[in-house]
């Protein structure tokens, strides 16, 4: 049976689509249809009929033809109170029939007397979301036409009688019902026609309009390659589009017939594959939610098995389907609503039979009533509010509302109102409007139920009216625009920078802070670290969502002033900052660039060298190098030449920066010539010759994009007075062809990261005089902008997991014949610069099957190509599990609060997610002193007294001098076991002379308690985590240590002089270590441990012992790197401690044995015997810094400590049970190369793992071993349920085989024994002389046997014998004898 969305592909209809059905077949199908109807009625027997009595009894026995439809709608409107309904027409069909719409919402007032058409609909109501339901788009699909009339009567009469649900609905919702979009087709259709085949040529059946056009293929389509469809043949579609454009519909349903399913966008795809291709929107989760809301309330649809004649085997999981996955529909209405309007529309197939007999109408109404009302109610989910002018307070119409991470914007209505449909989660929303500064609100929580309310107040770019000017008059629906004084550039004339002078460091710092303060909605000022002379290495980020990487948005950087005396790049980047900030929101080019790109501008990489340079310098090297006199552009690792000079702080900072962000394109701004220089910069021979990179064509293209906008550079003869013979065709050159530069930054970017970088020489004079600076801006401003635009060339997209649709981190994208792969970022997003052409691109990832696609790249922007990878071992795993129980891996949960928490963890894991949380913390701390043992004890008791419901204080044991080793648990149920919650411990003070860790843990404890129930993030973390804090492991040593003693070892050991970090062995000798081992580590119920120490600034991971294979190195290093990366300086890998100033620790992370090798360490014991990963954090170079440094140390470590609380909720959490559902505790979970954890009470286990694919083996006594694979995400936990089968094996073999073999063996043994017995019996009855022994009484016989056993010849002779024959004489003789 053909569905209502469109005609099925021929393969779906088979012979029914090609030949008229013979009469006998029609009879069989009608009989089958009757049986199907009986099946449906049986399935619905338990459905309660609600509201049916509200309609007149006679309305279910006929269809509404011609004028009867309008009369029925008028009657429905009359069923409600005055001012509730408004009937109007949006236009006419081909044959002139009106396209009626009934509007239902409270407070409409009396209808206008002279209004007609769309004007008769009445005024819009501020803040009230608009919902439309459209029926009978295909004229022969008639159920929708009828049920919308019934719905109208139900809503109106229900409002009149005071039904609370319907009153609330119509008081808050603007509902529009269009029962028939194709009234002409309806009049041609025939009652009882279930749509089993075509009824004639186009235009003669009821499906199409009167001109033979399918209305659901006549809308503009985003994936169409031809001209947009003409609307002349489809006045119905033209009328609908006009109506949609005049309104801001939020939600819509398109009601069809021919199946029973809810379909959602997209309806087609670029490939237009007939079926089976899931075409996902950016709002796929929302659409699935809406479709499920309808289907779950429909008694047939929710089963997912409509059993429609002709498609009996067709099923839809949960009763929903993606449109294109079902079958491709080009030009459909639901996609048009989503792509070209604010409206989220789904398509609803209401019945198998398109035009069922009128006798079935009551049942169809009862089937769909609850679903229809529920769908309308869903317009109130997500986030709603108003966008207003901060000066006038008027609403801003058509302001854009964007959601970070979702590539689909909506716009505000006439009053500035918006309703953004979203599923539960945490979101960052941005409102922007031309002429206003954009505003972003972060961490907006959306919960199940009514929408979260959030208003935006936007500042105009011109903040006040000039004196003497006339203020603009504001009326509803308009935006106030103040009069602009003469000479002010218009929106088509970009504002040029005015600040042209040399900025020394203090001046540059003020400049950057000023623009960061004036334009907070598009800027973020941050530092990469410090130069040798401790000057900040500033970077200004410019983006419409500063501080956040938006998936799919490329990142770009400019670096200036790498050589301190080459200053033009420094000043141009300051000019560029001013230009971008002042023109955002008014200049289309700048606005589009900032909205689509995350831009990072570093004006000075060498601020120390700059301060030594001299204005007017053309050729000298004064100030070129950094303060350690190293050339920074010879200081990067090189592919051809070993760089022996020590890596400089500025170099380390930049390398850490570039590896932390997904940069796509970059330029390094220099001076001394006028040319764009591209990789490679050197070669193996070290001579000046062309050194081509694999992407030579790309580098030439992006280099030309800069040079051709600079006319002097493009000429190719830059410095005639200085270098007479130097010539660069078109102003570009290969680096090594010009001269060899080993250790250059641009080659390192290309070889070690995804970033393509070129070096741009901006002028022959390195440090020009100040009055020449405007000339440099004028020469380079277009080049700077055009070069940034190159970041949007080539190929972009996402690499996704086919199982759950999530992005795959670090997947590899390879281009055939170009030996330079790139990798994906956290959301699976990638960018690959390419010149126009056709390429074969392969996406691959560990644990997945690679996918290759042919891609054509054009010159007009990047082409988007997504890859969906299937996990490589899925089939093998499924095969291996047959007959042996099973395991399932899933990230889904039906618990709304769990979903909400998962969304929170994902948000906090995003870039700057934790920073936003810390800014929102309602309470923070001011550390000002150290705590002695007595103070520490009182502090902990005070926390327990003030927060008794979330804290529990216990002692693990006592030190040598009988001081308690306190343990504080923070949890929502601290005295109740919750094995399903992850457990994390923070420990400090193992060395008493390093008490900074102790103070940081006390601060962490207080921070969590203070913010509990005051900050939603802290509250959820505490509610879902068991946090154990042990602030002082060595209280005796702490009492002896002295403040401000940075190097002393006093207090390093315990009272027995033992370094406790060498005493964690199986025969621990000290009471402190025994207490920790027995009461903390050996409980084996922790998922993560963080130990704080002092003496440097880095993180170490196991093992500390010198010779030890690190089985789970990837995970341990991942955890250590996570702490370091959230620390402002640790990740730079340069502690700069006085006793080791040249120390370089890549990423701030090192294996313990490489840092300080020793045996008996706490973290080694924790990993080996506690099965818990532990990292050691060294918080400061000074063991015992002054108390005045504590606030700074808390600020540095706070984010890292909190990141551990977030991280403990990732990895894999699972449940192990048997087939009966009984949890199995103490099962062994073996991961990858042998890491072991044990299931807790209730069968729960949790283990942290680095992102990627991991193998899991589960072992339990009496059960068969289970194996599965799980994919771990970087921002969420993966769940796995392992179900065991009872182990019926004996000696490793199946029980049945062992029993069979054993039975056969026993039978053989018994048979053999019998045969031997028989043979022996025969032999024993023979005697050599023909006599045998007389038979005696039983007792005598036993005695004789015993005598025989002696083997005595004498006894043998005393026994009588008889021959083998038993004659009568012998018997007589025997009896007488």
From Swiss-Prot:
Compartments in which it is found: Cell membrane
Extracellular side: 38-1296
Cofactors required: Zn(2+)
Lipid-modified sites (S-palmitoyl cysteine): 1314, 1318, 1320
Name of this chain's protein: Carboxypeptidase D
Gene: Cpd
Motif (Cell attachment site) on chain: 161-163
Keyword set includes Lipoprotein: yes
Gene Ontology MF annotations: metallocarboxypeptidase activity; zinc ion binding
Any Pfam family matching the protein: Peptidase_M14
GO terms of biological process kind: proteolysis
Binding site for Zn(2+) 1: 138, 141, 256
Family matches, as SUPFAM superfamilies: Carboxypeptidase regulatory domain-like (SSF49464), Zn-dependent exopeptidases (SSF53187)
Regions of compositional bias (Basic and acidic residues) in chain numbering: 1038-1047
Co-factor: note: Binds 2 Zn(2+) ions per subunit.
Cytoplasmic topological segments: 1318-1377
Organism: Mus musculus
Membrane topology note: Single-pass type I membrane protein
Signal peptide start-end: 1-37
Marked site: Important for catalytic activity: 349
């Amino acid at each position: 049976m053909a569905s209502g969305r469109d005609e099925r592909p021929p393969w779906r209809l088979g012979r029914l689509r090609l030949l008229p059905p013979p009469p006998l077949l029609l009879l069989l199908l009608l009989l089958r249809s009757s049986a199907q109807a009986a099946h449906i009625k049986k399935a619905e027997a338990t459905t309660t009929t609600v509201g049916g009595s509200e309609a007149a009894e006679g309305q279910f026995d006929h269809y509404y033809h011609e004028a009867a439809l309008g009369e029925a709608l008028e009657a429905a409107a009359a069923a409600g109170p005055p001012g509730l309904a408004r009937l109007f027409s949006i236009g006419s069909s081909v044959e002139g029939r009106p396209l009626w719409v009934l509007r239902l919402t409270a407070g409409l007032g009396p209808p206008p007397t002279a209004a007609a058409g769309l004007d008769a609909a009445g005024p819009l109501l501020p803040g009230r979301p608009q919902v439309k339901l459209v029926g009978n788009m295909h004229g022969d699909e008639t159920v929708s036409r009828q049920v919308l009339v019934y719905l109208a009567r139900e809503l109106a009469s229900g409002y009149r009688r005071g039904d609370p649900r319907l009153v609330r609905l119509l008081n808050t919702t603007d509902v529009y019902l269009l029962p028939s979009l194709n009234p002409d087709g309806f009049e041609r259709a025939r009652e009882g026609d279930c749509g089993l085949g075509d009824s004639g040529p186009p235009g003669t059946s009821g499906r199409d309009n009167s001109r033979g056009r399918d209305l659901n293929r006549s809308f503009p389509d985003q994936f169409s390659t031809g001209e947009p469809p003409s609307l002349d043949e489809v006045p119905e579609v033209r009328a609908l589009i006009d109506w949609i454009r005049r309104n801001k519909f939020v939600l819509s349903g398109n009601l069809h017939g021919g199946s029973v399913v809810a379909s959602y966008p997209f309806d087609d795809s670029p490939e237009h594959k007939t079926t089976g291709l899931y075409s996902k929107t950016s709002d796929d989760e929302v659409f699935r939610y809406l479709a499920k809301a309808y289907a779950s309330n429909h008694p047939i649809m929710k089963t997912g098995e409509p059993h429609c004649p002709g498609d009996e085997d067709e099923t839809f999981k949960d009763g929903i389907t993606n449109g294109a996955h079902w079958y491709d529909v080009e030009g459909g209405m639901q996609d048009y609503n989503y792509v070209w309007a604010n409206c989220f529309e789904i398509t609803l197939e209401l019945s198998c039979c398109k035009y069922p007999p009128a006798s079935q109408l009551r049942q169809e109404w009862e089937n769909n009533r609850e679903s229809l009302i529920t769908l309308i109610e869903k317009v109130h989910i997500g986030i709603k509010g108003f966008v207003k002018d901060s000066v006038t307070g008027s609403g801003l119409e058509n302001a854009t509302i964007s959601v970070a991470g979702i590539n689909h914007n909506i716009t505000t209505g006439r009053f500035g109102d918006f309703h953004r449909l979203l599923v539960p989660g945490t979101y960052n929303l941005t409102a922007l409007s031309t002429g206003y500064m954009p505003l972003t609100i972060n961490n907006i929580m959306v919960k199940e139920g009514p929408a979260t309310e959030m208003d935006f107040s936007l500042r105009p770019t011109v903040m006040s009216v000039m004196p003497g000017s006339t203020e603009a008059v504001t009326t509803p629906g308009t935006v106030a625009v103040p009069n602009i004084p003469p000479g002010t550039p218009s929106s088509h004339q970009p504002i040029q920078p005015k600040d042209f002078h040399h900025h020394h460091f203090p001046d540059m710092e003020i400049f950057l802070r000023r623009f960061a303060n004036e334009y907070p909605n598009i800027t973020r000022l941050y530092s990469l670290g410090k130069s040798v002379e401790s000057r900040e290495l500033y970077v200004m980020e410019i983006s419409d969502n500063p501080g956040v990487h938006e998936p799919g948005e490329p990142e770009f950087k400019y670096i200036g002033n790498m050589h301190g005396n080459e200053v033009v790049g420094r000043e141009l980047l300051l000019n560029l900052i001013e230009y971008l900030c002042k023109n955002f929101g008014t200049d289309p080019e700048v606005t589009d660039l900032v909205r689509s790109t995350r831009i990072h501008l570093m004006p000075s990489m060498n601020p120390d060298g700059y301060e030594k340079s001299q204005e007017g310098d053309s050729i000298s090297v004064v100030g070129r190098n950094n303060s350690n006199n190293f050339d920074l552009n010879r200081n990067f690792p090189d592919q051809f030449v070993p760089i022996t000079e020590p890596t400089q702080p500025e170099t380390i900072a930049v390398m850490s920066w570039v590896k932390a962000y997904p940069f796509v394109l970059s330029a390094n701004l220099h001076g001394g010539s006028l040319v764009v220089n591209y990789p490679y910069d050197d070669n193996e021979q070290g001579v000046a010759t062309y050194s081509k990179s694999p992407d030579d064509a790309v580098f030439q293209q992006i280099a030309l994009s800069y040079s051709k906008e600079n006319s002097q550079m493009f000429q190719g003869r830059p410095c005639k007075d200085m270098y007479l013979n130097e010539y660069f065709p078109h102003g570009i050159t290969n680096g090594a062809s010009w001269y060899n530069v080993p250790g250059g930054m641009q080659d390192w970017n290309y070889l070690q990261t995804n970033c393509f970088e070129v070096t741009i020489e901006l002028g022959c004079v390195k440090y020009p005089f100040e009055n020449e600076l405007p000339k440099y801006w004028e020469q380079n401003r277009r080049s700077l902008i055009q070069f940034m635009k190159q970041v949007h060339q080539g190929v972009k997209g996402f690499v996704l997991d086919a199982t759950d649709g999530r992005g795959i981190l670090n997947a590899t994208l390879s281009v055939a014949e170009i030996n330079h792969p790139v990798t994906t970022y956290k959301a699976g997003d990638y960018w690959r610069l390419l010149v126009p052409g056709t390429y074969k691109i392969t996406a691959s990832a560990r644990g997945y099957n690679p996918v290759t696609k042919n891609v054509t790249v054009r010159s007009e922007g990047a082409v988007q190509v997504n890859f969906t990878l299937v996990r490589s071992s899925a089939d093998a795993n499924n095969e291996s599990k047959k007959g042996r129980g099973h395991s399932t891996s899933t990230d889904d949960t039906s618990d709304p609060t769990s979903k909400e928490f998962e969304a929170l963890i994902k948000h906090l894991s995003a870039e700057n997610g934790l920073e936003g949380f810390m800014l929102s913390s309602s309470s923070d701390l001011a550390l000002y002193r150290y705590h002695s043992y007595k103070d520490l004890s009182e502090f902990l008791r005070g926390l327990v007294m003030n927060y008794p419901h979330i804290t529990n204080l216990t002692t693990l044991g006592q030190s040598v001098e009988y001081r308690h080793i306190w343990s504080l648990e923070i949890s929502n149920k601290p005295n109740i076991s919750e094995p399903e919650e992850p457990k994390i411990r923070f420990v400090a003070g193992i060395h008493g002379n390093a008490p900074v860790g102790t103070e940081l843990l006390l601060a962490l404890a207080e921070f969590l308690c203070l913010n509990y129930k005051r900050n939603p993030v802290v509250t959820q973390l505490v509610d879902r985590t068991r946090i154990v804090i042990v602030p002082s492991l060595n209280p005796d040593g702490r009492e002896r240590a002295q403040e401000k003693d940075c190097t002393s070892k006093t207090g390093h050991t315990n009272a027995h002089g033992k370094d406790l970090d060498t005493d964690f062995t199986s025969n621990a000798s000290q009471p402190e270590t025994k207490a920790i081992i027995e009461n903390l580590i050996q409980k084996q119920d922790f998922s993560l441990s963080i130990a704080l120490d002092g003496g440097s600034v880095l993180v170490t991971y196991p093992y500390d012992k010198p010779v030890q294979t690190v089985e789970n190195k990837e995970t341990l290093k991942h955890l250590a790197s996570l702490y370091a990366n959230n620390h402002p300086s640790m990740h730079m890998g340069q502690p700069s401690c006085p006793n080791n100033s040249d120390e370089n620790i890549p990423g701030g992370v090192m294996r313990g044995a490489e840092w300080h090798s020793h045996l008996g360490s706490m973290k080694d014991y924790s990993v080996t015997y506690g099965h818990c990963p532990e990292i050691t954090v060294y918080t400061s170079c000074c063991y015992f810094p002054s108390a005045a440094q504590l606030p700074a140390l808390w600020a540095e470590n706070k984010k890292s400590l909190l990141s551990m609380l977030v991280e403990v909720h990732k990895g894999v959490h699972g449940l192990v049970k048997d087939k009966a559902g009984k949890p199995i505790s103490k099962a062994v979970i073996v991961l990858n190369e042998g890491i072991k954890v044990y299931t807790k009470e209730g069968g729960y286990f949790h283990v942290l793992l680095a992102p990627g694919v991991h193998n899991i083996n589960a072992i339990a006594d009496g059960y068969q071993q289970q194996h599965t694979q799980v994919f771990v995400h970087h921002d969420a936990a993966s769940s796995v349920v392992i179900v065991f089968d009872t182990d019926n094996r004996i000696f490793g073999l199946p029980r049945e085989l062992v029993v069979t073999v054993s039975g056969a063996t026993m039978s053989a043994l018994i048979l053999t024994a019998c045969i031997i017995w028989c043979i022996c019996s025969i032999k024993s009855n023979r005697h050599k002389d023909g006599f045998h022994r007389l038979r005696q009484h039983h007792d005598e016989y036993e005695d004789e046997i015993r005598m025989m056993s002696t083997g005595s010849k004498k006894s043998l002779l005393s026994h009588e014998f008889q021959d083998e024959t038993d004659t009568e004489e012998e018997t007589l003789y025997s009896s007488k004898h």
